Amino acid sequence: MNITGKGAYDTGTYANLFQRSGYREDEIKARLEQTWNDLFYGDEHTRIYYPVGDDKGYMLDTGNDDVRSEGMSYGMMMAVQMDKKHEFDRLWNYAYTYMQHTEGRYKDYFAWHCKPDGTRLSPGPAPDGEEFFAMALFFASNRWGDGPAPYDYQAQARKILHACLHQGEQGEGDPMWEPSNRLIKFIPELPFSDPSYHLPHFYELFAQYANEQDRTFWKEAAEASRAYLRTACHPVTGLSPEYANYDGTPAPVQLHGDFRHFYSDAYRVAANVALDWEWFRKDPWQVQQSNRIQAFFSDIDVSDYRRYTIEGEPFNEPALHPVGLLATNAMASLAADGPDADSFVKRFWNTPLRQGKRRYYDNCLYFFTMLALSGNYRVY
């Protein structure tokens, strides 16, 4: 692993770890295309994308039978990375039409989940959706150019990010980033964070693409999030809690559950850290962190993945999304230079998409890892 020098953003060269592990370019390309086809147009046990009418579509959270801003924005990122404008525009039109608020305390934010018919189930937003929507829209603008509203991608992305930083300044509502420390919040109203929401590699790009007045903020947010992740990830195990205070310590138990431990949301941290390293190579800690989390899981079979304390103590409770956890552990190989990096790439390659009721979250993470390890999760 190249732990010196520049990231892919500067070099234009993205590591193809599948190829490095001995797989042929033609089989890698075929596998990526097949994975897209299975997720978007496969059988009812595998697919998570559903077109609606002439111009909309949604990503279904199959475990909860709803549509989430997380999944919609993930689907858009998948589509722009794969150069699939048709599906991208359908997803965006659905989110824009049914999920994005046009007034009130959540203006320009997205309701975090709704029914497949577009009926909102909760008005409040989940900020990981907004940041993925904005990044996917900027990439779409740069890949395909802008069209008439709502397909004026750049303007739509800037509108979202403006709300994220300035909501409440002229009226009701709260920003999604805490102005005093530049950290993303779990939800706008609460003073703590979710480590898996921290995407410094996105904020580096927001610092170039967002409204000019906010570019310094985004640059500072990238640095703040990198520093935050160093406090939120355990120094021995590499595990992080689902929710954490601004100092990185696990957040208190919430009315809706105990999120102090390493569980579903937290899996994404390993993937985010590794992609930030691949794109920008700004924090050598990310290499050691990736080695740590791979070392922790190196001798644990996927069938035995559990919920863990961040110190590494397993609960009896099995992981709800074991394939998703394997995927993010494998994506850590983008940054890892330890003895487990290659074996995780191969374990992932030999693991199929998840089928059945709980497949949505696993397979979203799976697809991002398929993109990343084939050198196709790129900056546009």
Curated annotation (Swiss-Prot):
Its EC number is 3.2.1.156. It comes from the Bacteria. GO terms for biological process: xylan catabolic process. Optimum temperature is 40 degrees Celsius for the hydrolysis of xylotriose. GO terms for molecular function: oligosaccharide reducing-end xylanase activity. It is an enzyme of class 3 (hydrolase). Pfam families: Glyco_hydro_8 (PF01270). It catalyses: Hydrolysis of (1->4)-beta-D-xylose residues from the reducing end of oligosaccharides. Pathway: Glycan degradation; xylan degradation. The active site is at residues 70, 265. Changing residue 70 to A: Loss of enzymatic activity. Optimum pH is 7 for the hydrolysis of xylotriose. Keywords: Carbohydrate metabolism, Glycosidase, Hydrolase, Polysaccharide degradation, Xylan degradation. InterPro entries: 6-hairpin_glycosidase_sf, 6hp_glycosidase-like_sf, Glyco_hydro_8. Belongs to the glycosyl hydrolase 8 (cellulase D) family. This is Reducing-end xylose-releasing exo-oligoxylanase Rex8A. It comes from Paenibacillus barcinonensis.
